[in-house]
Amino acid sequence: MAEEVIHPFSGLLILDLCSEIAGPYASKLFVDAGARVIKIEPRGGDPLRRWTASFQKLEEGASSPLYQYLNAGKESILLDPRDAQDRAHIAELAARADLVFEDWGAGGLEERGLDPNAWLKANPRLGIVRLSPWGQEGPWSRFPANDFTLQAATGSVDYRGLPERYPVAAGGRIGDWVGGTFAAISGIAAWRSACQTGDGQIADVSIFEAMIQCFTIFGDMGSQFTGGLLDRSIEIPSIEPTKDGHIGFCTITGQQWTDFCSMIGRQDIAENERYMDARNRMADFEFISGAIQEATREKTTAEWVELCEMLRIPVTPIGNGGTLPAMDHMIEREAFQLAPGGFHQPRAPWRLESCQPREIGTTSALDEDRAEVLDLLDDEPVQPEVDFGDGDLPFAGLRVVDLTAFWAGPYTTSILSDLGAEVIKVESIQRPDGMRFATPIRNEILWEWSHVFHGVNPGKRDVTLRLDDEDGLGLLKRLIGEADIVIENFSARVMPAFGLDAETVRGLNSRAIFVRMPAFGLSGPWKDRAGFAMTVEQVSGLAWVTGYEDLPLVVRGVCDPLGSAHAVFALSLALEERERTGLGQVVEVALVEPALAVAAEQVIEASAHGVVLGRDGNRMPHAAPQGLFETREADERVAISVTTDAEWKSLCALLGADDWRLSESLSTHAGRYAAHDALCARVSAWARPQSRDEILEQLRSAGVPASAAINNHALWPNEQLKARRFFQTLDHPVTGKTRYPSFPTAFSHFERELHSSPPPTLGQHNREILQGELEVPEDEYDRLEEAGVIGTRPSFI
């Protein structure tokens, strides 16, 4: 008899009351890690069972490939909350569960006769994750919304695109995947806290707030530092034509920009300081873009990749559902797996040394597992013993040595800090975190004015150590010796070059968990390539479904925080493994793999149905009509999106469109999608004479998703965010009182304001850490400072 495989979350019981994408993705992550997940479905089942983006006709009773990807390995039971006995069954199952995920909207459980507080009374350690567009409370909490209208409300749509053309939203319903990812780590937080305290709680996740963290590049912080509105733009360079296709470039740093200009033979542009500022490149778009494309068309994609690799300029081929599985890097890393349904899907987006993700399970038909699920009710609920920890926050008592830079890594440790961990950020005065310099502000201490650095580094202490110096490296090793977690996000070659490979870290501290987040992983032909979020968006397919029909555009940064949240999830698995074995291990979360996981629909559609999904501005397969509509005020657009039959009927009634309401061809989503442009033209004619506020009031009252498409720098003031206390004001040593976005979940047992301190200045805690904790003598401290091993100002300024 085969030995039972133990996974990190073996033994966890989770109820999934969710449908579509967000909630099912959250619970899918737990399935991959070994949890038992029971999917509770309404009559008719999850609508995603019958959905394909290419409008395929599925066999009777068959579940769509995307549904299978999200729900394989879960047990299905049909329980209708309108039925008293079914409501009782749901409550009895909740009494035996560790976590419940639900997405029925603000007050949705209560409206269906279900009482989450009664569930907590019956099962005091239960974590209830409530996922909704705006959150459970606040003046907007019951406004209809979806991914498209939420994107518009964050301010992320208005600034994406060419100034002479219309703004475009990100494709692929990426906001739903973002919401699901943050729901998963909110579930982790509630569950770990319950294990430490014995107290369960409700985690109220706002998809809107999660999308603010992921889509806006901290635009509200930018508005505080620079003022004014943000112009619509695209990245230069980004996705450019080659002799045989397209290629994706990314020049985040000044060095990458000048090297790129030299590579294309435009030393004149490289030497023009005006173009070090990306805003000036956009202002001279025709000249700069023309110069770039004149050069890029002269070589093949492969030739440009080879040149960029030599110069360490982030580069990638452009991926889509058809090309991704055939890329050499994806093949070598086995990034895609064959599902039982016969299509290809991304593997779980994490790798641990101690275990593999659970094998892909089969997909249950609706109510297929009813008998097995109800058998659970024959046994009395068992409450596990409490392992009292260092506090109620889930990562309290853990020390993190943070070697990361830019966004994905620092935001990972920011989440850990918010949720209780002690984080020591390590920089050097020779090479501070490069994100410190991503700012248009030019003053004597500009490195303390980067809005993204501020956004991803609250709650940390900062020490500077020169790692190519024996003394600096020695001090870092002492910190590692006392750490629970060490984390870095450079390409695979960087840490070993400093003498900090996995074996060295293990030798310093056998219990340390070494989290590594290179763009493309620790193996494969691309492992030494540098890469940022835009690079990952270009290759993963996210850019392929975003933009104009003739021009794919990057989503702008979303892959960084997505990678961060997945890294927190993966780290939680390693912590469970350490409880079992007493040992740390390497945790690998290649930034590209969470992106592949949330862009999965493209590879799934291509492999299952032979259809390569594309892009067409704001027209997307899941909604019709959908678009940004002009109002009578200039630049005050309204985002409107119809995804359900009920919303369609409400729109027809509001517009007095009896012909639409009675049309047989428009009675289905497929029919409406076929008539999309004509529908949008009529909605546009209705909206254009009215004010934005008038339109929003009518649509929201009618139950049609709609939001103002605000400027990226106009998020605040916002009555919903104020009511939810989403922003936390902290007094920074340089920028003064500054408004910071917080974690997008309101926990019933945690403080809402989770940032323990403002972001640190460079080397702010050198004395506190080196002298106070490592007991470096005063004369030695002075010598290190004199030698440039430590310091508080960049050595090159």
Where are these regions (language model features)?
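Conserved anion/nucleotide-ligand pocket segment
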Residues: 166-220, 552-606
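Mobile, glycine-enriched helix-loop/loop "lid" segments at the mouths of ligand-binding/catalytic clefts
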Residues: 46-61, 150-157, 432-448, 536-542, ...
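N-terminal Rossmann-like NAD(P) cofactor-binding subdomain of oxidoreductases
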Residues: 83, 99-158, 469, 488-544
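A structured beta-alpha segment of the ubiquitous adenosine-cofactor-binding alpha/beta core
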Residues: 3-4, 15-18, 59-121, 297, ...
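Conserved beta-strand scaffold positions in the cores of enzyme catalytic domains, especially
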Residues: 37, 76-78, 128, 202-204, ...
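Acyl-CoA thioester-binding alpha/beta core of soluble enzymes
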Residues: 1-45, 55-58, 91, 96, ...
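The feature captures the short pre-catalytic strand/loop hairpin that immediately precedes
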Residues: 154-170, 540-554, 749-750
